[in-house]
């Protein structure tokens, strides 16, 4: 039997540490970011990091060029008079085109150019249903009075479809034999994520320092942000794991009861946490201790001006505290009704045990 009459195996979940913050550390570009998740139970960062990485690289939906037609060209193993690049080079360049489809599963785009000029991706004709991300991508170089007329086939998908398997593309099965004349397949890389790596560091919860911190380093192709990539991967994992989740009624009731108990307090239970759990610098921690600020609920009621008037407390310490409070969805200068509550030490201990 999986359950007895009194105790559910799922009740053990209540004792696990749950992440309290997700931070996004961005580089200068919108395509690269570090996503930081903490605290996690020891070993969980490795499990989650590996699962999220694999899903982001293999299962996210994106858009890619899966084929082209060039006027006057019947196959890729040829060249075009007056064009510097061979058709093979043009095909490889088209494989690097990154685009985004909005409300459409596939699209045919047109490119018409006349030399002398460099033909860039930004010269492709688009509409509201399709946008080009890397508009500076070089497609080819045209000589004097040379014309290039190209049809570009774009579709949504996931993973990678090489030209050796292009006949598996369902869209090609809808094309007539006449339409397939001159069709040149392109290696289709649909994944919007270029690179993902992760590392695990120690995280601190109060006086406990053996918890995990997961840091995901993500680089996308610009069609989505790293935050969106993590969000999509997490949702995919959630959907795949849903069938394994038990319908244990007693566990659900305990979850509802726990949630209702938090609401009965009349304020955010995070306020019952001690400032020792905020992982502040020694200077900031000592300043709060000297001012008899024990709980986060005590701290948030202080204004910035009051904090700056504290001895040895400067702007750097203020910014540090504001950043930590922001991760909890809190700020300085808040008005907390009925604070401090009666038996605050007992409530704080109860809240810690529930976490």
UniProtKB/Swiss-Prot annotation:
Highest rank taxon of the organism: Bacteria
Its EC number(s): 2.7.7.6
Region (Alpha N-terminal domain (alpha-NTD)): 1-248
InterPro entries, sorted: DNA-dir_RNA_pol_insert, DNA-dir_RNA_pol_RpoA/D/Rpb3, DNA-dir_RpoA, RBP11-like, RNAP_asu_C, RNApol_insert_sf
One MF term in the entry's GO annotations: DNA binding
HAMAP family per record: RNApol_bact_RpoA
Stated role: DNA-dependent RNA polymerase catalyzes the transcription of DNA into RNA using the four ribonucleoside triphosphates as substrates.
Family: Belongs to the RNA polymerase alpha chain family.
Name the UniProt record assigns to this protein: DNA-directed RNA polymerase subunit alpha
